[in-house]
């Protein structure tokens, strides 16, 4: 039996985000192996650049470091950290143990944030690179859905009360528009990321200036060389000990905004499921309730809403962290950032995987939609009926009064008796309206009440959505599979 508290055992807590929800690729980006392997890569890049610029570092030392990037003794590192109470120095010693010839030049001139902060920036960049195509796929699936149903009339709702008609595709475009804004914001914040670079303990580069005997140009070159090796186009010119924690605010703000979009979309789907107009996918063997076998609960959408709320709250962490970074740095950030950055990305990853799964299997029930339209459309059509009567020679005021009385009677049947809306039957039975009886079918055609909805869908997809998705064409075929 595993000892109580062993990580990974059933006797120890594990984050559901990692163990239950998030994708393996996102979990790996925030794993210890990826983090500490990147630390070693950063030490190698630093040594290579220092050697190129003339410091006494041998090819043999460089090769030894290269050969041991993946040779990480996690047990030794944990023991060293317990002894030293310092995670970076624990890994300096652990790396040095398997690179004895290079041990003396590992971390030369650097501070802990050289590996810590630069690794975080690499992780943020790579995590954003994972989210971008996932969000693009969600938008693509919803765009297909919207295009297919661009002209399908449905009852609109304002205040969740019946309003004028729209189309199923046009409503979906409201969702897509928000997600397109999120995609643009994710891309912007990803492209705006800058490397911390090689800055020293308080950002002044004093240690490197000393190493290069006061040669400003070599210090600048060192910073640029390592930045280039890490794949960043530019580094911060100004830092304290850390990169400004405003970066974390920007990144998590975009993720929180994505959470708001997903929450709105999935709430709409849940409400439509209650109305029986639309459903998320429901597996053949899926059980909706342990007590009520008929239930078809929208559990995927509910999960998205649940996790989206968590994602929206996480932005408070970097806001408060940035506000308490006294002078060049305090350690108020460290423990908090270990939690909030990973949780934000694992949560965003989960809701995008889930929303893609939902969007790939949305089910629409046109007959239910049609029936609901029939219940409300007669009231909406009264103005058109009045106009038709006036054109046929009737009085607007007389017609308005007739319609008012018949509408109240029909509303009473619906609300007091639980019956169907029979306003049109009442109009058909009233001789006063005989001049337009033959026009009623045309006047009640739902498609005549949706305005330019279908044209708006087509233009929106062609002018805004498809161009935005073009860079992601090569990854569009990936399906979203949910285990739970």
From Swiss-Prot:
SMART domains: ADSL_C (SM00998). Substrate binds at residues 20-21, 85-87, 111-112, 241, 303, 329, 334, 338. Transmembrane segments: none annotated. There is a cross-link at residue 415 (Glycyl lysine isopeptide (Lys-Gly) (interchain with G-Cter in SUMO1)). GO terms for molecular function: (S)-2-(5-amino-1-(5-phospho-D-ribosyl)imidazole-4-carboxamido) succinate lyase (fumarate-forming) activity; N6-(1,2-dicarboxyethyl)AMP AMP-lyase (fumarate-forming) activity. One of its GO terms (cellular component) is cytosol. The keyword Lyase applies. It catalyses: N(6)-(1,2-dicarboxyethyl)-AMP = fumarate + AMP; (2S)-2-[5-amino-1-(5-phospho-beta-D-ribosyl)imidazole-4-carboxamido]succinate = 5-amino-1-(5-phospho-beta-D-ribosyl)imidazole-4-carboxamide + fumarate. Pathway: Purine metabolism; AMP biosynthesis via de novo pathway; AMP from IMP: step 2/2; Purine metabolism; IMP biosynthesis via de novo pathway; 5-amino-1-(5-phospho-D-ribosyl)imidazole-4-carboxamide from 5-amino-1-(5-phospho-D-ribosyl)imidazole-4-carboxylate: step 2/2. InterPro entries: AdenyloSucc_lyase_C, Fumarate_lyase_CS, Fumarate_lyase_fam, Fumarate_lyase_N, L-Aspartase-like, Pur_lyase. Belongs to the lyase 1 family. Adenylosuccinate lyase subfamily. This is Adenylosuccinate lyase.
